[in-house]
Amino acid sequence: MPQKWISALLLLQISFCFRSGNCGKVLVWPLEYSHWMNLKIILDELVQRGHEVTVLRPSSSVSLDPKKASGLVYETSPTTSNNDEVEKSFYPVGDMWTYDVPKYTCLRYYPSLNKMFGQFSDLWLQLCREVVSNKELIAKLKESQFDVVLSDAVGPCGELIAEILQLPFVYSLRFATAPGIEKYSAGQPFPPSYVPIILSGFSGQMTFMERVENMLCLLYFDSWFESFPAKDWDPFFSEILGRPTTMVDTMKKAEIWLIRSYWDLEFPRPSLPNIEFVGGLHCQPAKPLPKEMEDFAQSSGEHGVWVFSLGSMIRNITQERANTIASALAQIPQKVFWRFEGKKPDTLGPNTRVFKWIPQNDLLGHPKTKAFVTHGGANGIYESIHYGIPPMVGIPLFAEQRDNVAHMVAKGAAVSIDFHTMSSSDLLNALKAVINNPSYKKKVMWLSAIHHDQPLKPLDRAVFWIEFVMRHKGAKHLRPLAHNLALVSVHSLDVIGFLLACVLAIVLLAVKCCLFLYRFFVKVAKNKRD
């Protein structure tokens, strides 16, 4: 690169520093796959603004490649596990959730979730222990004098590293329905009467029986979340910090929660001042497609193209399911970009092209794209909302995807079908519905207008709050004071108990007075008769 361009880039970074405050030093504890993809967007923007960003990664990492640094500094911690072990801790979770976990009621599938998350937790605890027990690494991090730690709340350890280094920390998280992490760690209010619990697939307007199930699932999830970290993580945190503590108490110290969602996807619900919604921060302007893909898209003529993707966590689907899908796609006039890594289906039509990878963002922003078949991942849904072009057919597979699709269906922007029970005709009817009924496209365009009508873009908002924490050494004035109260006090159970005791005392006193007066007048009447 010519010297003048290097100088120009340096001046640009310096200008960002003056505009947003002093340049800071950010330490990052990320998670793999789509979590990393979203976090990296924030990190790249921080680098563009002149901040020094250091990513702390275990040597056994699947997604975090130091060779693709793009301005990031990587600090690698040696671990005893290898990349295959890390990869195997993620993919079986997706496969098990998709094929083995019972659906329809939380009371049936939460026991399976406990098993799956237990496997992930064991590996992640091992990685965390090896990082924080590395005295040489911790000493180096202390000498670096970071200003803030940015961490993914799903993968514990970032908050522990921040506590060791005595630094404020900011969380990045997708969920926004508060049954576990946000409810206990962030203090997020959760009225189960109109806020559906995560993984329920309910809309904001629940029937009476759905509200009953929602309450039961909430109680079940509360019990699970309280017991889950107590076995291994709480003793580990206490051991490392040298004092009795819990993982949840440490997580409560988060200054800001960056929730990767927004009100275009979420239902209205209470929130807190240290919770910022930044859904869609990863959306970028569409880039030109590779020549092969562009030629295929242009060959669609007036019919346009469909984009079909079930995400990266499900590498293979059964041959029977693949043939069901291919058969339906072969019957539509549109061309289809299908992200699929399995064996070529026997029923694949000439209008369908299979790719192991597709530039999903660029395809959804392409003028030929008419609709989108998605597993309901937040990234894909927000890319669709961002462009406001393709309505959706949702085929949720696991995690919060069922909720994401349910939200889009409730908002009139999608049709949902069940992956396990759908027939070729079911999928075909859903495809025809979103193409032939203009109301779906109108709803997506409406959501897109809402998404873009914000005072700050999601990425700018996320970066602002990270810089805010660096400038002010935290954001304790925004953290809820509920963190200082016991659980009985948070829900005013002590006050309710006190008031009930007062009412009971008054009632007992009134009864005593009535009995006294009754006995007195009975005695007086008796004396008069005598």
UniProtKB/Swiss-Prot annotation:
One of its GO terms (cellular component) is endoplasmic reticulum membrane. It comes from Rattus norvegicus (Rat). UDP-alpha-D-glucuronate binds at residues 374-380, 400. It catalyses: glucuronate acceptor + UDP-alpha-D-glucuronate = acceptor beta-D-glucuronoside + UDP + H(+); 17alpha-estradiol + UDP-alpha-D-glucuronate = 17alpha-estradiol 17-O-(beta-D-glucuronate) + UDP + H(+); 17beta-estradiol + UDP-alpha-D-glucuronate = 17beta-estradiol 17-O-(beta-D-glucuronate) + UDP + H(+); 2-hydroxy-17beta-estradiol + UDP-alpha-D-glucuronate = 2-hydroxy-17beta-estradiol 3-O-(beta-D-glucuronate) + UDP + H(+). CDD domains: GT1_Gtf-like. One of its GO terms (biological process) is estrogen metabolic process. Residues 1-17 form the signal peptide. It is found in: Endoplasmic reticulum membrane. GO terms for molecular function: glucuronosyltransferase activity. It is a single-pass membrane protein. Keywords: Endoplasmic reticulum, Glycoprotein, Glycosyltransferase, Lipid metabolism, Membrane, Signal, Steroid metabolism, Transferase, Transmembrane, Transmembrane helix. Glycans are attached at residue 316. It is an enzyme of class 2 (transferase). Belongs to the UDP-glycosyltransferase family. This is UDP-glucuronosyltransferase 2B7. UDP-glucuronosyltransferase (UGT) that catalyzes phase II biotransformation reactions in which lipophilic substrates are conjugated with glucuronic acid to increase the metabolite's water solubility, thereby facilitating excretion into either the urine or bile. Essential for the elimination and detoxification of drugs, xenobiotics and endogenous compounds. Catalyzes the glucuronidation of endogenous steroid hormones such as androgens (epitestosterone, androsterone) and estrogens (estradiol, epiestradiol, estriol, catechol estrogens). It comes from the Eukaryota. The gene is Ugt2b7. The chain crosses the membrane at residues 496-516.
